[in-house]
Amino acid sequence: MNEHTSNPIIEMSGVSKWFGDFQVLKEVDLQVFSGERVVVCGPSGSGKSTLIRCLNRLEEHQEGRIVVDGIELDQDTQHINKVRSEVGMVFQQFNLFPHLTVLENCTLGPMKVRGLSKKDAEALAMEYLQRVRIPEQAAKYPGSLSGGQQQRVAIARSLCMQPRIMLFDEPTSALDPEMIKEVLDVMIDLAESGMTMICVTHEMGFARTVAHQMVFMDEGRIIESSPPAQFFSEPEHERTQLFLSQILSH
């Protein structure tokens, strides 16, 4: 994906953010085009999670511009709500409602926000639960599911809002090792469907498989951005080389 005839679906220009006196993002520039999959990696505290949380205004940037699907994220509440309706997000923790069944977790948003009838919302939810390979869990409560199953419910719940963009913030980091593959397999299926995705992850095998663009962050800056073949075989920056040597040796 080196040539693009359309405008980017996500554009960050000179984005900076502080937590108090600590600058967590430093003049970040990033473009993502429709259908692209971008993997963001880097050491702990490099600003990865803050970067993607700014894309649906879970965090507010102080300088620069963020435009998502043609809408600038500014102080306008209508703009923020419109972007949030286009952007799904999956976190480290599953954030499912424990008192609702799997099906109810998935239908709540479409009914409350998108105005779907219960019948239509349930049909949509079952379609996505099938897609993440757990339709048989629909009547169960989250507490009875494994971590991998709960994370797949969280992915299905986001997809039920029919977003144009999906953000993943280290979705496998809270899982037991044997459950990681089942979640990554679902994410690979989603990538192959053409969904625009930005994933913060250290799952480098997944990154090699699905990413169009690798982004490496350190100390609040994007240090390197390149296609996976180049990123893994010929990283330009010494800091990237050190990071990869450490993470790929495990």
Predicted regions and their residues:
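Pre-NBD coupling/linker segments of ABC/ABC-like ATPases
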Residues: N2-H4, T240
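C-terminal boundary and immediately downstream tail of ABC-type ATPase nucleotide-binding domains
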Residues: S225, A229-H250
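ABC family nucleotide-binding domain
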Residues: N7-P228
